[in-house]
């Protein structure tokens, strides 16, 4: 259960939210966050393949583009702070999706 969004979600949900929405490219790419996360799951006894973890992470990253758009629609773009937040949030989200080639997931629908 995700108490922030009050919904049942994939384990990679919070990881994707943090990494794709909050981290700048250099920090995002400095470490294999999905592998690190997966190793922690495995160390706690979770049986889950890295490939499945990466696939679900990509799905979550694509999903969070919606969050970025919704949040940006509520910002005051008339001031520099709101404009900078919107540019950062959308920029991080779109860069992440491009790096992950997550738009290709839409071809499978």
Where are these regions (language model features)?
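Active-site activation/catalytic loop segments of kinase-like enzymes and analogous catalytic loops
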Residues: 8-46, 61-84, 92
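Alpha-helical bundle/repeat cores within regulatory domains of eukaryotic proteins
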Residues: 55-61
């Amino acid at each position: 259960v995700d108490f922030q969004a009050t919904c049942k979600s994939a384990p990679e949900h919070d990881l994707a939210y943090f990494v794709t929405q909050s981290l700048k490219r250099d920090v995002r790419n400095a470490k294999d966050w999905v592998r690190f996360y997966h190793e922690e799951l495995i160390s706690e006894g979770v049986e889950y393949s890295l490939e499945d973890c990466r696939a679900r992470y990509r799905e979550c990253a694509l999903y969070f583009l919606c969050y970025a758009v919704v949040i940006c629609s509520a910002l005051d773009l008339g001031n520099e702070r709101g404009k900078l937040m919107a540019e950062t949030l959308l920029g991080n989200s779109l860069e992440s999706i491009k790096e992950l080639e997550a738009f290709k997931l839409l071809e499978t629908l």
